[in-house]
């Protein structure tokens, strides 16, 4: 899908660049594949804000997307490509030969009428899914499982992909778009191709209201707050803060590493930080 820019007929149109979604399905989603979605405004079950800058926005229906692809050796036809408000990628409605319908993440170059299939060893075509054990090395994949049978967790957002670069014992080596080199079990499933809507990051919404429609609220700078609200707050006039930039809870906010999951460190062969200068 291409980008669409607008003439500056109003201040909100000036600089506006959106994805051209004219080729997507214009009707409602399949009702049996949707669920209601309750807004929580970034609050948890105790009512406290656990995710800042969230709230409001247009009402959404949740589309049930098949991230597992466990229906092996049954061919399916792509009925249509749809917009999904709950993710940055587009989704594809597929219909299996036995009549069952499902939503999957739409990869790039997947078109209406194409056939897709999941199995132990299938053709290397966008939309087909198989475990790494039957996949040729060098394949570009998305929707990668971290645990066999759990469903894809890696490379699901618009334009992302991982590359299958080698085998190591019972593990597959994959290179992620962040530069990280990581091991996953060879029984883990992955879908061929890169995720659709790669131009998503090149959009310019033109006005604050478009972000509000998406449920994104304004982000207030720490230096504009009072000392009670933020470590950067307070001071007469504009102040530099006098310390390294931190979050409201005092953790470094510009690249300080806070990852503490040591049990899975052994699966990371090369850190995503390794390519950075001086590290």
Swiss-Prot record:
GO terms for molecular function: rRNA binding; structural constituent of ribosome; transferase activity. PROSITE patterns: RIBOSOMAL_L2. One of the primary rRNA binding proteins. Required for association of the 30S and 50S subunits to form the 70S ribosome, for tRNA binding and peptide bond formation. It has been suggested to have peptidyltransferase activity; this is somewhat controversial. Makes several contacts with the 16S rRNA in the 70S ribosome. Keywords: Ribonucleoprotein, Ribosomal protein, RNA-binding, rRNA-binding. HAMAP family: Ribosomal_uL2_B. Coiled coil: none annotated. This is Large ribosomal subunit protein uL2. The keyword Ribosomal protein applies. The keyword rRNA-binding applies. Part of the 50S ribosomal subunit. Forms a bridge to the 30S subunit in the 70S ribosome. Residues 223-279 are annotated as: Disordered. Residues 269-279 have a biased composition (Basic residues). Pfam families: Ribosomal_L2, Ribosomal_L2_C. GO terms for biological process: cytoplasmic translation. Belongs to the universal ribosomal protein uL2 family. One of its GO terms (cellular component) is large ribosomal subunit.
């Amino acid at each position: 899908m291409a980008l669409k820019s607008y003439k500056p007929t109003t201040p909100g149109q000036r600089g506006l660049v959106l994805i051209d979604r004219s080729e997507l399905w214009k009707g409602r989603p399949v009702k049996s594949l949707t669920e209601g979605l309750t807004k929580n405004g970034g609050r948890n079950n105790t009512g406290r804000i656990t995710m800042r800058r969230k709230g409001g926005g247009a009402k959404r229906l949740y589309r049930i997307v098949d991230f597992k692809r466990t229906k092996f050796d049954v061919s399916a036809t792509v009925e249509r490509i749809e917009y999904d408000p709950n993710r940055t990628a587009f989704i594809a409605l597929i219909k299996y030969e036995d009549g069952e319908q499902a939503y999957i993440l739409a990869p790039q170059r997947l078109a209406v009428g194409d056939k897709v299939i999941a199995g132990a060893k299938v053709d290397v075509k966008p939309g087909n899914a198989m475990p790494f054990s039957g996949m040729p090395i060098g394949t570009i994949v998305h929707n990668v499982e971290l645990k066999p049978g759990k469903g894809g967790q890696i490379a699901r957002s618009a334009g992302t992909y991982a590359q299958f670069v080698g085998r190591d014992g019972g593990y597959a080596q994959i290179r992620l778009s962040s530069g990280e080199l990581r091991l996953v079990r060879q029984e883990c499933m992955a879908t061929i191709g890169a995720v659709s809507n790669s131009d998503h990051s090149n959009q310019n919404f033109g006005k604050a209201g478009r972000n509000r429609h998406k449920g994104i609220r304004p982000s207030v700078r720490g230096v504009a707050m009072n000392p009670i609200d933020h470590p950067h707050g307070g001071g007469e006039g504009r102040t530099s803060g006098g310390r390294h930039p931190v979050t409201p809870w005092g953790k470094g906010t510009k690249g300080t590493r806070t990852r503490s999951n040591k049990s899975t460190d052994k699966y990371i062969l090369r850190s995503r930080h390794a390519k950075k200068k001086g590290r």
